[in-house]
Amino acid sequence: MHFDTEEWFYGQKAYVAVVKANHENIAKQYFSKFGTLALLPFNQDLQHYSIILCTNSTSDAKAQLESLNQEFNLSLDLKDIELGSGFELKHVRAKKMFKDRIVLCGDAANSFHPMAGQGLNLGIGDVMYIDSYINKLMESDLDTLMNYNSTRNQKNIQMTWIIQSLYGIFGNAEGLGEKIIKGGMKFLDRIPSIKEKIIEFANKN
């Protein structure tokens, strides 16, 4: 069954791998002229990171990762890492999240740049809504289906433009753009209440 979608490519490739590091169970993200690097805690033994490297450069991905490892003093063990060929990053959002007796949720309804890590949160929000109204949805109640589409699609549209804005800002993290980013991050660190509100908004999706 076909669903109408909006979609575009980000002009970046993503690479995923696991490396050994002492991460203290803290997720981190770094921004550079190459793109973004996310380090996500993987094991409970505090010895592994899951790496997501999103790059807009055509140069060797492992060489870029080694450069970032030195630039940010990450102390990652990259000796045996295998990044493979990567995959193209693409935005896809279903314009309507139901058709006939089929309801879309999670990655079936939208796919975002992993920069902000919000794809999972949005998918969980979809599932929570479906769980709350499962009986009416199973009956294909039109009002419930339309409310689901309106409520969740609004969240998806909001996140689309938030991520596009972040991508535009951090995708030009050099010169004046770099100074603005660093200034903004320092401002947030000085005012925890604003940072907490941003985190609260992200988690509500």
Labelled PLM ranges:
Residues M1-G84:
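Conserved FAD-binding catalytic core of PHBH/FMO-like flavoproteins
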Residues S59-L142:
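FAD/FMN-dependent oxidoreductases across multiple families
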Residues E7-F9, K96, G177:
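A generic structural micro-feature
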Residues E24-N25, L39, L46-Q47, T58-D60, ...:
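Domain-wide signal for the mature, well-folded portions of proteins, strongly enriched
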Residues N73-L74, S132-N205:
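C-terminal helical "tail/cap" subdomain of flavin- and related membrane-associated enzymes
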